[in-house]
C-alpha cells in the first residue's frame, strides 16, 4: 500500500510536493477507512479534487513514473518547463508484507541517467518513534555510496547510471539487493492505473473468458450497478440475437472501441428479459464504463492491489461512485487501496464517508502548483468534523476551485456579433 508520494521538478510540480496516505490516529472517526498493521496506519482511499489543468493528472503521472521505473519500463519523466534543471526527483514510501519501506531516486532527463537512488526500511520502536535503516544509497553527484551488502558497495561507483542498480547487476549473487529488488518489483506490480475517459474493456473481457469465482464477482458487481440487467457474460456468437444490419454497428465511444478485438467485444453480452445483446452496442456509456472498471475493482479487493483511477466520476452516477469507494473503505477490505481524482463534490462527505485526511486538493496559481489535504485546515480556520465541507469548497474557502470567466467570453461573442451586424449594414 502507498503511504507517501514525493515529487520535485516533475511535470507541473516545480517545488517539492508530498502526497500522504498516512492516517492521523488522533482522529477516531471512520476507523474502518484505515488499514492497521504492525503499528503502521494507512488510508484505504483518497480522493483528489481540483480544477482542470491544475495538476491532478500530473500526480497520477508521478505514480505511473515510479511504477514504470521500478518495473524497468520507459518512465516518461519530464522536468518542469519553468526550471533550468533537467533532474526529476521522485520518492515513495509504502507497505509490503507488513513492513514499511522508502525509495527515492533522481533522474537526469537530458542525460537519461539515474544519478541518485536510496532504499531504506523503516521501523517503529516501543515508543512509536520511527527509525530508518539504509539498505542502499547511490549518490553519483556527491559520490556517496552505501550498501548493506558490502561486496556491492565497492562496485556501485563504476556501474552504469542508465538504469537502477538492481537492473545493472546480477542481484541473485547479493542477498539484500536481491530482496530489495523483489520488494520493489512486487510493490510496483500491484499498481493498476486507469483513466475512466479512456478505460480499456479488454481487461474485463479476458477475465470474463474464465469461469471462476473472480468472474462471478465481476458479474454480480455489474448486475448490481444496472437494476434492469439479468446477466452479463462472454458467450458464443450463436447465442447473440442481432437484427439485420446491427452486426455492422460500432460503439459510439471511441475510447471503448478496440477494432482489433471487436469480435471479443461483440461476444461480451448483457441479458435483458432473456435476450442476449452486445453490451458495446446497446448499453449506455455509464454501464460500459462500470463493466470496464469492474474487473479492476474486484481484482484489487480480492488480491490486495492498488487501484489508481483518473476521473472516477466520468459518466457514472454519483451513487455508484460512492458505492465503489465504500467497497474499499469497508472493514472487510484488509489490503486493497484506491486513489482517485474526481470533480463530484457529493463524494466530499466527511459526515458519512471520509476522514479529513482522505480528501486532497491540487491548487494552481501564478506562483506554482500546491498539493494539500483537508486535514491541513484547522478548526480555527473553520474546518471541523461537523463542517459542511462541500459548501466550504463551493465558496472557494478550500482553494483548488476553477475561476471561469465564461460570461466574459459570452459577452465578447455577443458584442462581436453585434459589430458584424453593424458592419454588414
Language-model segments: which ranges?
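P-loop NTPase motor core
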Residues: 84-148, 362, 374-387, 391
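Pre-Walker A-like glycine/lysine-rich segment at the N-terminus of P-loop NTPase domains
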Residues: 1-65
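Conserved ABC ATPase signature
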Residues: 45-50, 248-298, 306, 312-316
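Electropositive, glycine-dotted interaction segments
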Residues: 106-243
Amino acid at each position: 500500500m502507498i503511504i507517501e508520494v514525493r515529487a520535485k521538478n516533475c511535470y507541473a510540480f516545480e517545488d517539492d510536493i508530498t502526497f500522504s496516505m498516512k492516517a492521523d490516529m488522533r482522529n477516531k472517526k471512520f476507523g474502518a477507512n484505515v488499514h492497521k498493521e504492525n503499528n503502521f496506519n494507512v488510508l484505504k482511499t483518497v480522493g483528489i479534487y481540483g480544477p482542470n489543468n491544475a495538476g491532478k493528472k500530473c500526480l497520477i503521472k508521478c505514480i505511473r513514473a515510479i511504477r514504470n521505473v521500478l518495473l524497468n519500463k520507459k518512465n516518461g519523466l519530464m522536468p518542469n518547463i519553468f526550471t533550468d534543471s533537467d533532474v526529476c526527483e521522485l520518492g515513495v514510501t509504502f507497505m509490503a508484507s507488513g513492513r514499511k519501506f522508502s525509495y527515492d531516486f533522481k533522474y537526469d532527463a537530458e542525460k537519461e541517467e539515474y544519478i541518485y537512488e536510496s532504499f531504506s526500511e523503516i521501523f517503529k520502536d516501543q515508543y512509536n518513534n520511527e527509525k530508518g535503516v539504509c539498505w542502499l544509497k547511490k549518490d553519483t553527484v556527491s559520490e556517496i555510496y552505501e550498501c548493506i551488502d558490502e561486496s556491492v558497495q565497492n562496485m556501485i561507483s563504476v556501474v552504469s547510471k542508465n538504469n537502477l542498480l538492481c537492473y545493472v547487476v546480477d542481484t541473485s549473487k547479493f542477498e539484500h539487493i536481491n530482496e530489495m529488488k523483489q520488494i520493489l518489483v512486487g510493490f510496483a506490480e500491484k499498481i493498476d492505473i486507469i483513466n475512466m475517459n479512456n478505460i480499456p474493456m479488454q481487461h474485463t473481457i479476458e477475465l470474463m473468458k474464465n469461469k471462476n469465482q473472480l468472474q462471478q464477482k465481476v458479474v454480480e458487481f455489474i448486475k448490481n450497478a444496472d437494476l434492469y440487467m439479468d446477466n452479463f457474460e462472454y458467450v458464443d456468437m450463436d447465442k447473440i440475437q442481432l437484427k439485420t444490419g446491427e452486426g455492422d454497428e460500432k460503439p459510439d465511444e471511441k475510447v471503448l472501441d478496440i477494432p482489433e478485438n471487436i469480435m471479443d467485444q461483440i461476444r461480451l453480452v448483457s441479458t435483458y428479459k432473456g435476450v442476449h445483446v452486445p453490451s458495446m452496442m446497446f448499453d449506455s456509456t455509464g454501464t460500459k464504463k462500470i463493466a470496464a472498471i469492474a474487473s479492476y475493482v474486484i481484482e484489487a479487493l480480492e488480491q490486495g492491489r492498488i487501484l489508481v483511477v483518473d476521473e472516477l466520476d466520468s459518466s457514472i452516477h454519483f451513487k455508484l461512485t460512492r458505492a465503489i469507494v465504500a467497497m474499499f473503505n469497508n472493514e472487510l477490505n484488509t489490503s486493497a487501496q484506491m486513489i482517485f481524482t474526481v470533480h463530484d463534490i457529493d463524494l466530499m462527505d466527511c459526515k458519512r464517508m471520509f476522514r479529513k485526511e482522505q480528501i486532497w486538493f491540487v491548487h494552481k496559481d501564478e506562483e506554482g502548483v500546491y498539493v494539500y489535504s483537508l486535514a491541513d485546515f484547522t478548526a480555527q480556520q473553520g474546518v471541523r468534523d461537523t463542517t459542511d465541507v462541500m459548501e466550504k469548497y463551493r465558496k472557494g474557502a478550500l482553494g483548488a476551485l476553477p475561476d471561469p470567466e465564461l460570461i466574459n467570453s459570452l459577452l465578447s461573442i455577443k458584442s462581436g456579433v453585434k459589430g458584424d451586424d453593424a458592419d454588414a449594414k
